[in-house]
Design a protein with these regions (language model features):
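Surface-exposed short loop/turn segments
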Residues: 56, 70-115, 121-137, 153
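C-terminal motif of bacterial Sec signal peptides marking the signal peptidase cleavage site
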Residues: 16-19
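N-terminal segment of the mature soluble domain
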Residues: 29-77
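Bacterial N-terminal signal peptides that target proteins for export
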Residues: 1-8
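C-terminal/domain-edge helix-coil "capping" segments
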Residues: 130-165
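Bacterial signal peptide processing site
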Residues: 21-23
Length: 165
């Protein structure tokens, strides 16, 4: 009887979770992105993340006529601002914002440019500077991952749009 209750509980929990539309993040269907060229510096975190996410990608320095799509990272701007202050007037929370300016060069010669923005916040604690620095690093990493994901989705939609024409 106890085993039956456990099975019913697990079954009902899985039905509730699947019915609310919950699904795991992180996977992107990249079947149309077999070969992608990335124009950017190897020191650029976004370029490195793109190489990790797109297994058939290559990093190039100069853009030439290619039969593969090219992602060109034009510029990344980072800004940091105070979100809140405590009663003594010191910063309690910071927000980091990054804007990625990119250019997509598709195999048919079409060029698309755009901007992507992502931000994250973290708590600031003066007495724990090492932990605060780590929080800032984690926030920067999450912003870079979000921008990379958005850029891949933009490339995928641009490729689908040119294939449908």
């Amino acid at each position: 009887m106890r085993k039956l209750i456990q099975i019913l509980f697990l079954l009902s929990t899985s039905i509730i979770i699947s019915s609310c539309g919950y699904q795991l993040r992180g996977s992107i269907n990249i079947d149309v992105l077999d070969q992608v060229l990335i124009a950017g510096s190897s020191e650029n975190e976004i370029a490195r993340l793109l190489q990790q996410k797109l297994p058939g990608s290559r990093l190039i320095k100069n853009i030439t006529e290619e039969k593969y799509p090219i992602i060109r990272i034009v510029n990344i701007q980072t800004s940091k601002r105070q979100l809140s202050v405590n009663s003594s007037g010191r910063a309690d929370e910071y927000e980091i914002s990054k804007t990625l300016r990119y250019q997509l060069i598709l195999p048919d010669g079409t060029q698309q440019t755009g901007n992507l923005t992502s931000n994250a916040s973290y708590d600031f604690n003066e007495s724990q500077m090492q932990g605060t620095k780590e929080k800032e690093t984690i926030a920067n990493d999450s912003i870079s991952r979000a921008l990379t994901r958005k850029l891949i989705l933009r490339l995928k939609s641009a490729l689908k749009a040119t294939n449908n024409q």
